[in-house]
Amino acid sequence: LLPHIGFKDSDKGTYINVSYERPLGDKDVVYADLNYYSKAGYKPVYGLEHNERNFKVTYENGWYEDDDEWVRKENNIRFDYKNHHIAPGLPLSYSAYVERGLWKNDDTGRKSWHMEYGAFLNHDRIYLFNSKNTSLDLTIGKKWTRESAEDSVESTNVYYATLGQKISPKWNTWVGYYREDFTSNVFTYDQPDMAKELRNGLQYIMDDKNTFTVVNRYDLDQKENYETKYSWTHKFCCWDLSLIYKHKDIDNDNAFEVKFDFVNW
């Protein structure tokens, strides 16, 4: 049992989360994320996971949130085919997933049998300039989403590219390009905030206990800044304290979050 306590934002308020896991043998785990928000109420997630060498299967019931939209997943089953190399010596690997469940928007009451599946091709991390300090990660893929509420099937190509640079033992920076379209008109949960995103970050490791990070997100289609997030994390002996401030340029919205994560209990 590892508790997490904090203040999320003005819509959710103060929260407490307790995560519980219990093995049911070598390959099966039952788990629960018990989440309570002072404004949103009790939003738990219960699940069962079966793990094999090549794949895993997850069954879940519970609530998930994204951009203030609460979605309840009922009888949600997900199959993940784990990342595998195509052939020995070839720096390419592939992965895939299928997910299906009855989803419900808590605010609108709208329900839909949501089915989503995707496949991805990943390149092994590329180290540039004969140095481990500069790295490039590349992924391409395809996603499909079927919604019973609209009897629709939408798809999108997916392109991810991230270039990372370790400037010094204390400084890291990165820039990423992300391309993905909306595949659901019923839910905004787990959908991209924008179709074409340029993201860059800077991290300063002050010492073994303090880390400061800035992440900026830019909308390439609208040619405007989308969001900037500032975070500071301090490690204590048994728990971590995180202060997070987010400013959304698109609607001039500000959000502040405080997190206490217990790492030894």
Predicted regions and their residues:
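Transmembrane beta-strand segments of Gram-negative outer membrane beta-barrel proteins
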Residues: 1-12, 28-31, 56-59, 92-98, ...
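Outer-membrane beta-barrel initiation region
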Residues: 1-51, 262
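Structured alpha-helical segments in the cores of large, soluble enzyme domains
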Residues: 12-21, 46-48, 79, 83, ...
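Conserved short loop/turn motifs at secondary-structure junctions
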Residues: 33-38, 62-67, 216-220, 247
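Flexible loop and strand-edge segments within Gram-negative outer membrane beta-barrel domains
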Residues: 39-49, 55-83, 97-105, 110, ...
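Exposed, low-structure sequence patches enriched in small/polar residues
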Residues: 89-97, 104-265
